[in-house]
A protein has these predicted regions:
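Basic/aromatic-rich interaction segments and small domains that mediate binding to polyanionic partners
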Residues: 2-48
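Mixed-charge, Lys/Arg-enriched low-complexity segments
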Residues: 51
Length: 51
């Protein structure tokens, strides 16, 4: 995953906003919550790559 990628988990969409050696942060589009993507290692899928 890279910054700007659109990801999906159980029908919810999020944007990757930070990629570092110790964390990958995603912002959920429905409520703006920011979380570590490691919480969703199973089932988190890149929908659209920003390249």
């Amino acid at each position: 995953m890279q910054v700007g990628d659109l990801v999906e988990h159980n029908g919810y969409l999020a944007l990757v906003i930070c990629v570092a050696s110790y964390e990958t942060l995603i912002r959920w589009l429905d409520d703006g919550t920011v979380e570590d993507a490691d919480n969703y290692t199973i089932g988190l899928e890149v929908v659209s790559e920003s390249r």
